[in-house]
Regions:
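Structured, active/binding-site neighborhoods that engage oxygen-rich ligands
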Residues: 1-245
Length: 245
């Protein structure tokens, strides 16, 4: 992340591997949605937003060095704070659970927006969250890449390839300069792992690009069992809970 690394050739696992802020916040969103669903209150936005803030702070402060942006970390540390207008890609990196708790595309898009606005209440963040969650949902329902590209193309210009932008791309943590690249990392891939490698090879905010590519790639390609076995070695308790959900 942020090293300017520009290659698909790297060991997928190493002794330096650790869970990222992306994964932890995805678990927090899943916890909030699951609790609301169990209580029959998933349709009550204000209640769900309260749960989201609670679980994000509870899990986030358990691992304060996971790699959060400075503004989001400050938000985590001050429970009295509401959303702060962020257009950062944190709204997209954590949104995957919406694709599993929404029953229709419209519900998924709404849950995506709810998950974003607890901290990232900006139109760019809403757009990003809906695009990623919607793609993941449609992939779960059997959409092909043409269909997924057409759907995501409602939100972003995707007329580029990973190979075509790799050398010139200079990423940042804004939604508009990272979410399209994460989606195209999936669209240009021929496997789940290839999507991750595409994302990392672009440099920039590589863990978030990979979180986006992986959120769509898992329901589309599936994850090879051997890769799961290796990844499990790095799981924290928060991730283990959702392994077979």
């Amino acid at each position: 992340e942020w090293t300017g690394f520009k290659s698909k050739e790297f060991p997928l696992f190493s002794a330096k591997c650790r869970v990222t802020d992306d994964s932890l916040m995805t678990c927090a969103v899943a916890e909030a949605f699951a609790k609301a669903q169990q209580e029959g209150r998933l349709g009550e936005d204000a209640y769900v937003e309260g749960l989201l803030a609670h679980f994000m702070r509870t899990i986030g402060l358990r691992y304060p060095d996971a790699g959060y942006g400075s503004k989001f970390l400050y938000w985590l540390q001050h429970k009295e704070l509401g959303p702060y207008g962020s257009f950062g890609n944190g709204a997209a990196m954590r949104v995957a659970p919406a694709a599993y708790f929404g029953r229709t595309l419209e519900e998924v898009e709404h849950l995506a927006m709810v998950s974003a606005r607890v901290s990232h209440n900006h139109p760019s963040a809403y757009k990003a969250a809906k695009a990623v969650a919607g793609c993941a949902f449609l992939a779960r329902k059997g959409a092909d890449k043409d269909g997924l590209g057409a759907y995501a193309g409602r939100y972003y210009n995707l007329h580029f390839t990973v190979e075509g932008i790799r050398d010139s791309y200079r990423g940042d943590s804004s939604c508009d300069n990272s979410v399209p690249q994460g989606i195209v990392s999936f669209l240009d891939a021929d496997s789940f792992e290839d999507g991750l490698r595409n994302a990392v090879s672009l440099g920039g905010d590589s863990d978030t690009l990979a979180a986006i590519a992986g959120a769509i790639g898992e329901p589309f390609f599936g994850i090879p069992p051997l890769l799961v076995v290796e990844a499990r070695k790095y799981y924290l308790p928060e991730l283990k809970k959702w392994e077979n959900a």
